[in-house]
Amino acid sequence: MDNKKKDKDKSDDRMARPSGRSGHSTRGTGSSSSGVLMVGPNFRVGKKIGCGNFGELRLGKNLYTNEYVAIKLEPMKSRAPQLHLEYRFYKQLGSGDGIPQVYYFGPCGKYNAMVLELLGPSLEDLFDLCDRTFSLKTVLMIAIQLISRMEYVHSKNLIYRDVKPENFLIGRPGNKAQQVIHIIDFGLAKEYIDPETKKHIPYREHKSLTGTARYMSINTHLGKEQSRRDDLEALGHMFMYFLRGSLPWQGLKADTLKERYQKIGDTKRATPIEVLCENFPEEMATYLRYVRRLDFFEKPDYDYLRKLFTDLFDRKGYMFDYEYDWIGKQLPTPVGAVQQDPALSSNREAHQHRDKIQQSKNQVVSSTNGELNTDDPTAGRSNAPITAPTEVEVMDETNCQKVLNMWCCCFFKRRKRKTIQRHK
């Protein structure tokens, strides 16, 4: 691959350092003289391990540190490229608790590549592992962390707009942060503070849906511009999903996706908070009432919301010892293929069987532009296969197998979902 030609395409920025620390480069990358597919000078590209909303995910390895990484790839000719924007948002977020490290951004052949740290399983994967119900203690430990996580994102002038269990991951097993809940995938994030005027974005209506229908706020269903309040309401819906095992608006049938989203929104509005939170501590209802009453421009009282749950946590006599429901169950590790707990596969299979339609139609809303597509489960995505040239040697089979059971910080689809499109 002609590296000099690549240099002409983009202006030079920062090169990835040998240490593997964060860098942004326009250095042409691809097949090295040794026939290994590379991203930047450090990162060897391995096998495909999944697909995200807008591209493909590869296993990678930092040749200087021997650490495994995740490499997110997006075709340069994508109709709505967003990987560079996501990279910018990650840089804007910096090194906060529960924010994955980004090691590198630059071209890789006909693709843009972002290199991130590997993390552990998602909350959805762990939910499957735990018979699709979490205890109150586990939900509270998750909730307290995620309120802080969302507060941090908001403090960087971003709203997240993509709350779902698949986007929250624990750390890599064996890592010191393995019990920390991380937030990933900022492809749908948006600046709610205008970088030029330093003012809050204006209130608007008739907006296209952005987010995941199951968890998004009622106001999002109504076509209202999202702000900080909507991220917190979506979290509240997710907390109740974990406690209840399902939500009242799951499994609704409709002739078209648009009608289905309408039904989901109607059912959310028609379900009283008291009914949604019935048989659970009052604090769950108090949380939802508070976030639904917030004004579009209003800064949420994160301390109040955290205190709701920390007080309940203390009153129940719990200890914040990170003893989640999944502790003691067999999880993947980065040092070898570990036999999966049979309960995970059986629970997942049973769930997929009884909820097949519901899962396939609980869509992720894409940030690409286009029309509703009811047939193509990858409509609006850039999921074209990335194939190494025949002379390129990808990571060897043995090493790849050691980490193929690892989840990584860019959520890859465990279930393909049909998409609808939105305009920013």
Swiss-Prot record:
It is an enzyme of class 2 (transferase). ATP binds at residues 49-57, 72. Residues 1-35, 337-390 are annotated as: Disordered. SUPFAM superfamilies: Protein kinase-like (PK-like). The active site is at residue 162. InterPro entries: Casein_kinase-1_gamma_C, CK1_Ser-Thr_kinase, Kinase-like_dom_sf, Prot_kinase_dom, Protein_kinase_ATP_BS, Ser/Thr_kinase_AS. Residues 1-16, 348-358 have a biased composition (Basic and acidic residues). Autophosphorylated. The modification Phosphoserine is found at residue 382. This is Casein kinase I isoform gamma-3. It comes from Mus musculus. The gene is Csnk1g3.
